[in-house]
Amino acid sequence: MTIEVKNSIKPVDYVKSIAMLEKRVDEVLSGKKNELLWILEHETVYTGGTSSNTKDLLSKNIKIIKTNRGGKYTVHSPGQKVVYFVLNLNKRDKDIRKLINQIENCLINILKEYKILSYADKKNIGIWVNNRKIGAIGVRVKNTV
């Protein structure tokens, strides 16, 4: 199982990145392309999940993009690293909770290298430091990819 690793240096437009990821999902499903791990930053934008409400926004001057993911709002901006995985779960363990735990443990170990004590919360997905979220995790699966 070969995973292509892509690291974008300049901020990537959120809408364009999602279109590229959706195309890659279809290519992985059809066997045309390898799985992908894409590290990038986005231009400043709020993404609103299915539970988002504009009254929760801290700034009304930032572009808002509605998404089909769960959750409320997430702000993306230059300097904030985002890692997207496009994985074929037919070739891997299909346990999504296990995958999320592996990602959480990876983030905890990276922060530990910088002497930052962090933890995963059983009730709230993500990584936390002193009761404040430092790392968000979102997962979307389409036909096992």
Feature-to-residue mapping (PLM):
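Catalytic cores of processing enzymes, dominated by hydrolases/peptidases
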Residues: 132-145
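N-terminal lobe of the biotin/lipoate ligase/transferase fold
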Residues: 1-129
